[in-house]
Amino acid sequence: LRGAAAFEEWTDADTLVYTAAAPAGENVDRESMAVEEQDRTRMTEVLKQAKQKGMKTVVLLNISGPVEMADWLPYADAVLCIFIPGCMGGVAAARLLTGLAEPGGRLPVTFPIRYEDTPAYPNFPGEGNDAYYGEGVFVGYRSYAKRKLAVQYPFGCGLSYTDFSVELCENDFRWDMRTQETLNVPVRVKNVGSRPGSEVVQLYAREEKPHMLRPDRTLVGYAKVRLAPGEETIVNVSVSKKALRCYDARMDKWVQPIGAHKLYLALSAENILAQAPLMIEGKNPYPLNGESTIGEILENPRAKEIVNQFTNGMFDMIPKETLDFMVYRKLNDILSVGMIQVIPDTVKLSAILQGLYDRLAEL
């Protein structure tokens, strides 16, 4: 149903298909997340009337990006987001709706509940000719996860005409980046439905103790698998080093974090099926030195031991309650003040501290 077509003309049908639009383009940004005006004024009412008549209702979203759906979604039995599919989009949509083809795609964006929920909302459209991108690293699904904000449909979401069981084949992962370029994560997938179909297995990861502000989880790998009814397979989802890199503005370069991570098996950014620890080994982009915090030193048993050797057991002498208040203090600040009283010769003290920092950098 579209344009001037009258709903009354469709009273002999058992299913109503409503196509809604929300066009946009380069230099034609939308001012809201609403569908077109003609759809906004009649869409909810038409769907509501169809449901009252006992009809099935389907909404085709011929859109350029996410739209608000709260007003009409309760009256839609199914929603097929075709975005802007081109001149053969109608044929493709018909094949999908009639079951001749399967909707195997997954959302490349998040559909928020309200326009005001979007991470760009406070800064858009900017002032004059200036547009301020204030989201930082929290773009898209990363922002909603960080704010623990409910969404209409999450990034990576999508259905097919069958069901799948998806599970990790292992429950613990180690990755030595010095010898392995990629990490292969085996996932068992089975089509437990009655039709052939496809599933997109997604892997997200988070660094347990990041050195900077990081998203709660980031997509690091995915794989699409198509299976017949009852068919089962193991798919290896490949994770590259690049997928785990992050940019450190203080160091003005890309860094490769190592250490403890969490790996998430998911079917969307919000539909987490399982999680497993991931320990990454490699060259530390943040070698321990005088600029390291007391907390970072204490997290490394070997580093704590080295500091104790150079300071006659400093960490063993300081009460735990006091150490808890010092975790964010820099090691150099603590040692410079504390050791100058014992070693007033600044040249000798500097040599001792440099020796300590050299030992820490070797870890």
Feature annotation, model-predicted:
Residues 1-363:
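C-terminal non-catalytic regions of proteins with extracellular/luminal or membrane-system context
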